[in-house]
Amino acid sequence: MAAYKLVLIRHGESAWNLENRFSGWYDADLSPAGHEEAKRGGQALRDAGYEFDICFTSVQKRAIRTLWTVLDAIDQMWLPVVRTWRLNERHYGGLTGLNKAETAAKHGEAQVKIWRRSYDVPPPPMEPDHPFYSNISKDRRYADLTEDQLPSCESLKDTIARALPFWNEEIVPQIKEGKRVLIAAHGNSLRGIVKHLEGLSEEAIMELNLPTGIPIVYELDKNLKPIKPMQFLGDEETVRKAMEAVAAQGKVKK
């Protein structure tokens, strides 16, 4: 029997997802469709009767607004929320702002897949002359980060390396206290948590596509090991379509 339940939700589609651009640490907001996804995710949690005690999210508005929208739908906007850069999306470095299909046409789909999906190969770094360098690196929300902590680009391995200490030190104690935890974050920071929970290989986590705006439920034993595979809250068709849409990103438009 499950000792704990954990709910993860990847933010709804952002304005830059809609334009098929690499977002990374750029603070893109939700698109209208992404807002609807978050609403549906919240309604699925409401319909299933979920209650939470504490929430965690990144410092990026697409995840924060997804969380707000979910909390509104379940009428739990009063819950405490912890925001941290450690749950931010992977930093896509010099690729930030580029259209994924155009990048695939220029560098080849195989190279784009390596940058997007390889475990330990980072994209090219974001140099000071990048159009979004000041927008990200000089943003005051990151003023307390040391030079070592503030990335210019990240591989998935790098993203997981900065997300997992927060998971272990801040989130795990809350779960073990019996708190019902909701995490609203990003595809790659959530991948880190999923890889850790399920003990997935580097290859397996690279191929895992988490759908946007759909609550992911884990039932965990007392050692925080899943007692069954992740479950999605939502109808099967919604879940299938969402996962296919994520897999289709980064392919050359025919």
Swiss-Prot record:
State its Enzyme Commission number(s).
5.4.2.11, 5.4.2.4
- Residues where substrate binds: 10-17, 23-24, 62, 89-92, 100, 116-117, 187-188
| Gene encoding the protein | Pgam1
Chain positions found as N6-acetyllysine: K106, K251, K253, K254
Instruction: State how it assembles.
Output: Homodimer.
Q: Any idea which UniProt keywords this protein has?
A: Acetylation, Glycolysis, Hydrolase, Isomerase, Phosphoprotein
- Recorded GO CC terms: cytosol; myelin sheath
Protein name as it appears in the record: Phosphoglycerate mutase 1
